[in-house]
Amino acid sequence: MATTRFPSLLFYSCIFLLCNGSMAQLFGQSFTPWQSSRQGGLRGCKFDRLQAFEPLRQVRSQAGITEYFDEQNEQFRCAGVSVIRRVIEPQGLLLPQYHNAPGLVYILQGRGFTGLTFPGCPATFQQQFQQFDQARFAQGQSKSQNLKDEHQRVHHIKQGDVVALPAGIVHWCYNDGDAPIVAVYVFDVNNNANQLEPRQKEFLLAGNNKREQQFGQNIFSGFSVQLLSEALGISQQAAQKIQSQNDQRGEIIRVSQGLQFLKPFVSQQGPVEHQAYQPIQSQQEQSTQYQVGQSPQYQEGQSTQYQSGQSWDQSFNGLEENFCSLEARQNIENPKRADTYNPRAGRITHLNSKNFPTLNLVQMSATRVNLYQNAILSPYWNINAHSVMHMIQGRARVQVVNNHGQTVFNDILRRGQLLIIPQHYVVLKKAEREGCQYISFKTTPNSMVSYIAGKTSILRALPVDVLANAYRISRQESQNLKNNRGEEFGAFTPKFAQTGSQSYQDEGESSSTEKASE
C-alpha cells in the first residue's frame, strides 16, 4: 500500500511545484528589482542630446483623435518605448484592439469605462433580457424570447487612473461623460513579451486606422469571406460586415444612442458595489459641443434583469482567482496615496508591483510628482529603468547630465511635452512659479531611484571625511553638505533666492524666448 501511495504523492508534488513556478513567472515573482525582463536597447545608442517631444502626427476618427509621437526617433528606439495620446469625445467608443507590447495608460482628464478581456477567464457579468414579440403582443399573445449577454469585468476609469495593458490582451474604452477623455499610452516595445520587431503594433478587432501611409484594416479583413463565415458560424453577409471594408469611421466611433452593457454601481459615499449592475447610457441633461443626440430609453416591450456573476454555480481554479480577478487600474492622483509629502514643496506617489500587482504582467511602473511653486526635486538617477516623463500641468526647469558630466538637456518642460530620461543619467528638476505636475513611466515593475541629497540619500550615507577629501572642502562644509537637506525627502523647499534673471540660463539659450504653455 505504501509503495502505491509514494508515486501518487510524488506526482502531485511535481504538479504543485510546476504550477507554483508558473504562477511565480506569470506574476513576476522571479524578478528582483535588480533584474529586468527587457531585451535591452539598441547597441551603439547614444543619449548625447535629449529633447522634449510633442506628437508628430494625428489620425482623426469619427469621435476622437489619436496622436503619435515619433517612435522612429533614436531616443525612443534606444529606450525601447512607444508613446501615443488619444482623445475620445463624449459618446466615443475606442474599438476593441490589442497590442504586441505591454503598456500603461494614464487618464489625463475625463471619465468612462474600459474593459480588458483575458483569455480563459469567465464572463462574470451576466445580463438577461426578455424581448417581447411586438406582432404577437398586438394579437393578445404575450410570448417572449429570453436573451442573454455575458461579458468580462468592466472597469470605471477617471482622471488620475493608471490602467495596465498586458501584451496581447484585448481592450476597449467608452466615454460616458460630458467631456473628452484624454489618455497617454506608453508601451515597452523592448519587453520580452514582444517577440516581433521593436515597435508598437495595433491589432484591431473592428474598424480601421490610417496610421501609416497605407490604410490599416482590422484582423478579419485578411481572411476570405467564405472561410471566415464558416469559422464564426455566421452568414457571408455578416462576415463582410465585420471585415469593415467600407467603414471610414476609424478606430474611435460615436455611439450616438448610448452604449448599453453591465457596469458596477458606483456610490458617491463609498466604494464600488459589485452586486448591483446597470446599463450604460449617455448623459441626457448635458448639452456640449460634443453631444450629438440624447440617450434612448429601453425599447418598448423590453424588460431587463441583471444578475451578478458572483451567484454562478461554477468552480474557480487558482488561475482564475489570481489572474482573472486582478485590478486593471489604480488611481495615482489621490493625495491620500502619496508616499512622500512636504506641505511646502509637494508630494510624490509611486505605483509598483507591491501596491499594484497587475504591473507584474506589464513589467512597468509609474511615479506621479506634484511640485509646488519653485519647489525643487532632489537630484537623482534611475537605477534599474528608463523613464518617460510627461508634463501634466505647469512648467519645470529640467537638467540632465550624462556619465561624462555633460549636460544633455537643459530646458523648460511644458504641459503636454514628453522627455525620455535614460537609465543612470542624473536629473534635477525645479518647478516654475505656477508649479508643475508630471507622471513618469518606468520600464520595470519596481523602479529604484538613488537620491543625491536629503534623507536616505547618497550624501547622507557617506562619511564626513570622505566628502571633505573628495571635494577638498572643510569638515564644516562637508557637514553642511551632508545635513542641510538631511530632514527632507524627495521634494525640497527652495532655500536660496535667485539673483537676477540668469538662473539656469546659459548664454544664447533660446528657451527664454519661448512662450508659456498656458
From Swiss-Prot:
MF annotations from Gene Ontology: nutrient reservoir activity
Family statement: Belongs to the 11S seed storage protein (globulins) family.
Protein's organism: Avena sativa
Residue spans of biased composition, Polar residues class: 296-311
Domain (Cupin type-1): residue spans on this chain: 50-240, 330-479
Alphabetized InterPro entries for the sequence: 11S_seedstore_CS, 11S_seedstore_pln, Cupin_1, RmlC-like_jellyroll, RmlC_Cupin_sf, Seed_Storage-Functional
Protein name: 12S seed storage globulin 1
Keywords assigned: Disulfide bond, Seed storage protein, Signal, Storage protein
Signal peptide positions (record): 1-24
Bias type Low complexity, positions: 281-295
Location of region: Disordered: 281-311, 496-518
GO biological process: seed development
Function as written in the Swiss-Prot or TrEMBL entry: This is a seed storage protein.
Subunit structure: Hexamer; each subunit is composed of an acidic and a basic chain derived from a single precursor and linked by a disulfide bond.
Disulphide bond pairs: C45-C78, C121-C324
Pfam families, A to Z: Cupin_1
The keyword Signal is assigned to this record: yes
